[in-house]
Amino acid sequence: YRRQRQMCIRDRDYNSHLGTKRGGLATYSEERGFIRSIHNLESTYFRTKFEDELDKFKGNAGIGIISDTDAQPIIINSHLGRFAIVTVAKITNIKELEDELLSQNMHFAELSSSNTNQTELIALLIIQGKTFVEGIENVFKHIKGSCSMLLLTEDGSIIAARDQWGRTPVVIGKKEDAYAATSESSSFPNLDYEIDRYLGPGEIVRLYSDHVVQLRKPGEGMQICSFLWVYYGCLLYTSPSPRD
């Protein structure tokens, strides 16, 4: 989201439905740069872990995630600039991609339960591109599985990208002076956001405080995870109907 820091933290607390193990937040300000915090949530609730840290978060843009897989956000310094990234991903060829990146003299600094952190792997694929869009398209090209993501950049904007087959949702919400991107629109009514629209498969947008810029148009194919139709219990998409 792009909003005051208290709003970033409070808003994030309404989006903890699809994960239970780890929670992470990252904000950006010109004064202090990126600030990140990650906690284990297996024995407690999201709010109790982060409420004592509110004062350390600065800036009016932030991203966060509740994950059952990787410790995230990951913060990367690259030729594209510094950025923080969170992903909702399931990569079936992760070992193959790991070996390929290691053969290119890449290295992995973040491990999750002694395994490669797939969010870091995705970030390494992104920085192989000349731009963020080219890098995200590189992710789509190489992974087998699915990946939706949010990137928080040094200009305070947020890049949102939906999985190229639309398997997991990304919805944009708006209010008077803020935009938000999330996987679950159920949080918006409590926070006075209105649904702006759902991203299409493979669509990439950039969120600012007062507008959204489309960076990549959506594709034609849609292979939504059928579980989500039951999980959310509502009509989620106005884009093309699911198909095999």
Set out the residue ranges of the language-model regions:
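A short, hydrophobic C-terminal helix/tail in secreted or cell-surface proteins
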Residues: 240-244
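Conserved short alpha-helical segments that host acidic/polar catalytic motifs at enzyme active sites
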Residues: 2-6, 10-200, 206-239
